[in-house]
């Protein structure tokens, strides 16, 4: 075994320790491709053969030093001297011609199986048999090895903007990229990002971010110069959130407003994955009509889809579901244009039947939350976010115990929206049609929705516990129908009514 070793950091250890038979801590991506005109019939075989003959570099060649004991105090990443690329690169086929729903079935099954932590924890699956001669690539990796942001960046670097490029390196030929502060400040349509910039794992980043937020609180309180000011500002913000009577702050969502819901139960190991893709211009046009962001529109149609989906299951709460959102905001004490990563809570308007009024409710709550954060300095933002999320620990404990508390929950699900490549990308001449994030779920979070923009489209990845939420594909379809209803609605209803 190689003598070089890299210790796992606290965040990586958190995801390793969270691994269980029902809560697998891997994330992934699904990318359908269309071959170029005149492509040979064995194009995918050639790509698989090329992949298996490639050189693998770190971190893709690393395995755990003590896979038999995940809690080992000196757990590290070491080079796997017996690395077997044939194990990690796999090929399968749908019954041709397969459609998007049929593609979701094997991806759901693959995502339901844990990675072998005795080996470098990643796999890539080439799936052929899609209608029109198309194929798909599904990649999954353990969050402790590659965080979602880094993984997405490496995947993007392994694709080319040139359809004639046949020499571009594959993702496991690319070492870990550097990460600049600017990378974490990109956003689309209103500033929602996946936690601290990660792309593939909305829920995972929220949980991981909570550790950083708690550390941020400690940093605030541990600073002699800033503790008094920040603590006072935090207290003032919390009080103001309760006392504000103006229209904007009346819509602020607190940390104990989420109804008890089927989404907040214990989960099994089985997963179901579904996708949807919409033109960004369509969402922008609706947002412009109602003075809402792209993210507001996305949340509203998710709310509309969930309203119908849960109603059909007989599980629709009387009160609206509450969503947790990672956001980027500019603190009031930052004159240099820097941003702070935080979390907010917002309504999904699942208690509202009218699509326009649902969008109005969503927009009002996100505006109030972001306005609240903009009134604070950076330290107070971190402390406020930690305080806002603190009751989630009680929610998780009640879920695990099976005893519902008499008070509401903190949030019902996580939604993340992250920027992806603006240009069309190719692998060996085949055009990537979409990039769907495949995130993770956990106890008390049986559903996660992660969005990613790509080449003028917005791609939705729905991942859920199959046993808790049967027929998840219907939710994806209902989200599209909610978009159609919103687009067809009479604009006279407006946000001000």
Swiss-Prot record:
One of its GO terms (cellular component) is plasma membrane. GO terms for molecular function: diacylglycerol O-acyltransferase activity. Pathway: Glycerolipid metabolism; triacylglycerol biosynthesis. InterPro entries: Acyl_transf_WS/DGAT, O-acyltransferase_WSD1-like, O-acyltransferase_WSD1_C, O-acyltransferase_WSD1_N. It catalyses: an acyl-CoA + a 1,2-diacyl-sn-glycerol = a triacyl-sn-glycerol + CoA. The active site is at 143 (proton acceptor). One of its GO terms (biological process) is triglyceride biosynthetic process. The keyword Acyltransferase applies. It comes from the Bacteria. Its EC number is 2.3.1.20. SUPFAM superfamilies: CoA-dependent acyltransferases (SSF52777). Keywords: Acyltransferase, Glycerol metabolism, Lipid biosynthesis, Lipid metabolism, Transferase. Belongs to the long-chain O-acyltransferase family. This is Putative diacyglycerol O-acyltransferase MT3584. It comes from Mycobacterium tuberculosis (strain CDC 1551 / Oshkosh).
């Amino acid at each position: 075994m190689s003598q070089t070793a890299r210790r796992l950091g606290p965040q990586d250890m958190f995801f390793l320790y969270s691994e269980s038979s029902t809560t697998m801590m891997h994330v992934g991506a699904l990318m359908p491709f269309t071959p170029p005109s005149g492509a040979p019939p064995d194009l995918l075989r050639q790509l698989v053969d090329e992949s298996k003959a490639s050189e693998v570099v770190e971190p893709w060649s690393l395995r755990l030093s003590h896979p038999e004991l995940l809690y080992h105090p000196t757990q590290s990443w070491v080079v796997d001297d017996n690395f077997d690329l044939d194990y990690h690169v796999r090929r399968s086929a749908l019954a041709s011609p397969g459609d998007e729903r049929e593609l979701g079935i094997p991806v759901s099954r693959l995502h339901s199986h844990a990675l072998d932590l005795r080996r470098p924890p990643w796999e890539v699956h080439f799936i052929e048999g899609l209608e029109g001669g198309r194929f798909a690539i599904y990649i999954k990796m353990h969050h402790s090895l590659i965080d979602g942001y880094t993984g997405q960046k490496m995947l993007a670097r392994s694709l080319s903007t040139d359809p004639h490029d046949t020499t571009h390196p594959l993702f496991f030929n690319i070492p870990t990229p550097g990460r600049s502060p600017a990378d974490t400040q990109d956003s689309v349509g209103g500033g929602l990002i996946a936690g601290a910039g990660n792309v593939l794992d909305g829920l995972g980043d929220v949980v991981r971010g909570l550790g950083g937020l708690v550390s941020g609180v400690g940093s605030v309180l541990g600073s002699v110069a800033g503790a008094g000011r920040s603590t006072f500002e935090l207290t003032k913000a919390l009080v103001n959130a309760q006392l504000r009577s103006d229209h904007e702050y009346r819509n602020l969502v607190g940390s104990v407003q989420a109804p008890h819901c089927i989404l907040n139960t214990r989960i099994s190991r089985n997963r179901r994955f579904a996708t949807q893709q919409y033109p960004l211009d369509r969402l922008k046009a609706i947002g412009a009509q109602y003075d809402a962001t792209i993210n507001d529109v996305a949340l509203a149609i998710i709310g509309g889809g969930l309203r119908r989906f849960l109603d059909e299951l007989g599980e629709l709460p009387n009160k609206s579901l509450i969503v947790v959102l990672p956001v980027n905001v500019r603190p009031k004490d930052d004159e240099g244009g820097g941003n702070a990563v935080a979390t907010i809570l917002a309504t999904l308007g699942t208690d509202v039947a009218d699509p326009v009024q649902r969008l109005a409710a969503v927009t009002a709550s996100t505006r109030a939350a972001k306005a609240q954060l903009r009134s604070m300095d950076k330290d107070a933002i971190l402390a406020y976010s930690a305080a806002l999320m603190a009751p989630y620990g009680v929610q998780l404990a009640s879920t695990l115990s099976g005893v519902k508390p008499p008070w509401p929950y903190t949030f019902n699900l996580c939604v993340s929206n992250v920027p992806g490549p603006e240009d069309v990308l190719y692998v060996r001449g085949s055009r990537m049609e979409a990039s769907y994030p495949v995130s993770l779920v956990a106890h008390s979070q049986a559903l996660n929705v992660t969005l990613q923009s790509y080449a003028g489209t917005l791609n939705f990845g729905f991942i859920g516990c199959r046993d808790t939420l049967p027929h998840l594909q219907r939710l994806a379809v209902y989200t599209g129908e909610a978009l159609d209803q919103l687009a067809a609605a009479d604009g006279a209803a407006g946000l001000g009514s």
